[in-house]
Amino acid sequence: MNVDHEVNLLVGEIRRLGSKGNDGKFSVKFGVLFSDDKCANLFEALVGTLKAAKKRKIITYQGELLLQGVHDNVDIVLLQD
């Protein structure tokens, strides 16, 4: 699977699992994304896909590396609709 395809899938999953904030942008907690069965089956390396999407300025989140448990409450925000 190529990175662009995985990033597009990630955008769809953020929309599916997240909610739209007052700013009109979708966001989801990292823990929700990480724990979802569909996401677990879609992404071999979720953190790598998140980093690629952040580098492309499609999403944003605080920090550089997200770890299960430690960063479960970090918001992943979709910048592009």
From Swiss-Prot:
SMART domains: Costars
One Pfam assignment: Costars
Lineage top rank: taxon: Eukaryota
GO terms for biological process, alphabetical: regulation of actin filament-based process
Family: Belongs to the costars family.
Descriptive protein name: Costars family protein ABRACL
Species assigned in the record: Xenopus laevis (African clawed frog)
